[in-house]
Amino acid sequence: NIAGLFGGNHRTRNFGSSCEFADYRDYIAGDDITKIDWNAFARFEKLYLKLFLDERQMHTRIYIDASRSMDYGKGRKAEQALRIAALIAYVSVCDMDKVSVYAIHGGTVEEVFVGVHGKDMYLEQIGKLNDIVFDGDSRISEALLPASVGYGDGLSVIISDFLTDDNYEDAIDYLCSKRRDVFCVQVLTRDELNPKIRGKSHLFDSENIKKTYRRNIDKQIIEAYRKAVEYVTSRIRNY
């Protein structure tokens, strides 16, 4: 039941061979006699086996929204997303865990690097993040539902602006059904949270350049926009 060939620093609810005591159980013929608690035997005149917490190498899987809307704004959301992914990946390898990074393009998941462990391998592979092209749209649920996401072996991280009509909650539920911890990071720019544009404006959909809008941006539109942003942020925050 070992999740990897290398021991990790994450303690699981499974019993294993670490040094941290977890519980007792009755001795059964064939058990490792070195794990018998002889002090307990002297007290209760019954054989008990010491159980220890299993330390496993977990697998962190990071999914980056590579849609064109992420390549927007001062400081670019894409750059922030890559920094966050690099940081989480580094923390994972420092915990002696494996890490894989994927880019979500449209309704597909594309490998950036897979199964990286150790700082040396991390330094060799992390530059591949710069090869991600942010273009088109992303449909998180469509991409993740058919993907191999692992089972009960670590953390799944989704990094996105979540500016989508996609029912991404289905993807979160799917990951949870695979007994994975799920962490969502929403990346938005200050302009998206508090737009400064006013007056007559020509707007376009960054993920579909055929969709354009001409609007006179007034206080009412800004107020409606802010309510929409609050819905988008609260939707992922409260799920």
Q: What are these model-derived regions, one by one?
A:
Residues I33-K35:
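N-terminal juxtadomain amphipathic helix
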Residues F15-S17:
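A positional/architectural concept
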Residues N1-H10, D26-D31, A40, L49-R83, ...:
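Exposed, interaction-prone extracellular/peripheral surfaces
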